[in-house]
Structures are given as structure tokens and as C-alpha cells.
Regions:
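Domain-level detector for trafficking modules
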Residues: 1-66
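C-terminal, extended alpha-helical scaffolding domains
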Residues: 45-281
């Protein structure tokens, strides 16, 4: 998983040249221990409450989306994330099922071995012994398949669930910038109204000071508008890259899964084919 994560990072043009990434890859000494990793650490709780607060803020302030593209992509992202979550849950169930099959096969083979050791019929005992070997082979195949499914299927899909969360966080950051922009525009309106009232009241000194504050607020609003436009364009570019990579990766994930599954089924078939002749010598 770490290898896939680092490959994804160095494949990004901007992140590839990041000094922290370069240091991580070239550092020869032991890496520093992670901090605030506890589930209930103070830093973790602060991040959680901040996320909850931002979520409620987004609910409270509705964004009138002027770009149809973002409206469509956010809806599409929600649907894709839900589909990936379901697929991840199914892949986890598949892994657990294969592990259970491996464990059951091991238990069954031990029982067969005990049965073979106390069987009076030599031919039947030999057949049970070969069946024990067959079940041991089958259990080992399911164990290897569960490990491959974990690495190539479940973890890979789980990684994309996290990537969809990051994508939604990017949409959320755009919403936050828009919200700050709207707040800045509202602040300009308030200051202009205050300046007008002061001028009508003859308080020219205070009105002049407020005029400077208004100009500063206008500059801030203009900067936020530019920032909003930039983040919107950047998200569009990154989303296009993400979609291209996602399609390529999902195809590779499914192909690897099917290849390993076919290989496992071939091994199972060979195990049963080796055992099949032994049944012919069992006395009836």
C-alpha cells in the first residue's frame, strides 16, 4: 500500500519536486515516529470538531453553483464514492471468506489425517492420506488467494475510497473560498453603508477612515475572487487527471484479480486431478 501511495505521489508533477517527499525517499536514517496517532488524541479531537464545524457551516451556507460542471462532478463523485464503498465492503467479505475456507481446509485435513491413521483398510487409509494432502493444498491455495485479494483488490479499492474523500475535501475547500469571498463582499456593503451614514451625519473624519477600510476590503474581495477562480480551474485539471488514472487503475485491479483467481482455480483443479485416481482403488 505504501508503494502504491508513493508511486501516486511521485507521479504528480507538483508533488514530485516537494522537498518533504524528496527527503522521505532519500533519507537513510530511521524515520521519525508519527505523533498524534491515537484515536482519541487531543489533536485528533480538534481535527474532528473542526471537520464537524466545517460540515455544519457548509450546510448552513448554501452555495449557488454557477458552474454546471462542478454540480455534475460533485454528484458523480458522490455516486462513485458510494459504489467504491460497496465494492470495498464486498472485497473485504471475499477476503474473510477465503481465509475461512483456508482455516476450514486445514481443520478438515487434520481430521482426515487422524481418520487415515486409524483406518484398518490399507487402500482406504491410503486414499484418505491422499485426500489429506489434497485438502492441505486447497487450504494453502485459498490462503495465498486471500493474501493476493487483500493486497491487489481490497487495499487498492480502499485506497480509492480515501482518494474520493480527498476529492470531496477539494470541493469543500473551493466552497470555503467561495464562502470567504461572499463574506468579504457583504463586508464591503456594510462598510459602504456605514460610510454613507457617517457622511450624512457630517462625521467626515470617521468617514475618511472608513473609506480606507472599504478600499482594503475591496482588495481582499478581489483577491478572494481570483483565488476562487484559480482553485476552480485547478480542481478541473486535477479531476481530469484523477479520472484518467482511476479508469486505468481499476482496469488493472480487475485484471490482476481475475488473473490470480484463474491461477488459483487451475491449482485447485490440478489438486483434485491428482487425487481422482486414488478413488478408483477404494474397495467397494
Amino acid at each position: 500500500m505504501l508503494e502504491r501511495y508513493m508511486s501516486r505521489i511521485v507521479a504528480h508533477g507538483a508533488l514530485r519536486s516537494d522537498c518533504d517527499v524528496r527527503d522521505f525517499l532519500t533519507m537513510e536514517v530511521e524515520l521519525p515516529k508519527a505523533t498524534s496517532t491515537s484515536t482519541l488524541s487531543s489533536a485528533g479531537m480538534k481535527r474532528m470538531f473542526k471537520s464537524v464545524g466545517e460540515a455544519f457551516s457548509k450546510i448552513a451556507v448554501h452555495m449557488e453553483e454557477g458552474d454546471r460542471w462542478f454540480e455534475q462532478m460533485q454528484s458523480q463523485t458522490d455516486e462513485q464514492e458510494e459504489a467504491m464503498k460497496r465494492m470495498h465492503a464486498i472485497s473485504e467479505t471475499l477476503v474473510h471468506t477465503r481465509r475461512d475456507l483456508a482455516a476450514i481446509g486445514e481443520t478438515f485435513s487434520k481430521s482426515l489425517s487422524l481418520l487415515a491413521s486409524c483406518e484398518e483398510s490399507t487402500a482406504l487409509a491410503r486414499c484418505l492420506s491422499h485426500l489429506t494432502e489434497c485438502e492441505e493444498t486447497i487450504g494453502a491455495v485459498w490462503e495465498r488467494q486471500s493474501e493476493k485479494d487483500t493486497a491487489d483488490l481490497s487495499e487498492a479499492i480502499g485506497e480509492y475510497v480515501s482518494l474520493f474523500n480527498s476529492l470531496k475535501a477539494a470541493f469543500g475547500e473551493r466552497h470555503r473560498v467561495w464562502q470567504n469571498w461572499q463574506t468579504a463582499q457583504q463586508n464591503i456593503t456594510k462598510k459602504r453603508e456605514q460610510k454613507t451614514r457617517l457622511e450624512l451625519a457630517g462625521k467626515t473624519d470617521k468617514a475618511a477612515a472608513l473609506r480606507a477600510e472599504t478600499e482594503e476590503a475591496v482588495q481582499k474581495a478581489d483577491q478572494l475572487e481570483v483565488q476562487f477562480g484559480r482553485i476552480s480551474e485547478e480542481i478541473k485539471k486535477e479531476y481530469a487527471k484523477f479520472e484518467a488514472t482511476r479508469k486505468r487503475d481499476l482496469k488493472a485491479i480487475i485484471v490482476r484479480f481475475l488473473e490470480t483467481l484463474v491461477k488459483s482455480q487451475e491449482e485447485l483443479l490440478k489438486a483434485w486431478q491428482r487425487f481422482a485416481p486414488e478413488t478408483a482403488v477404494i474397495p467397494v
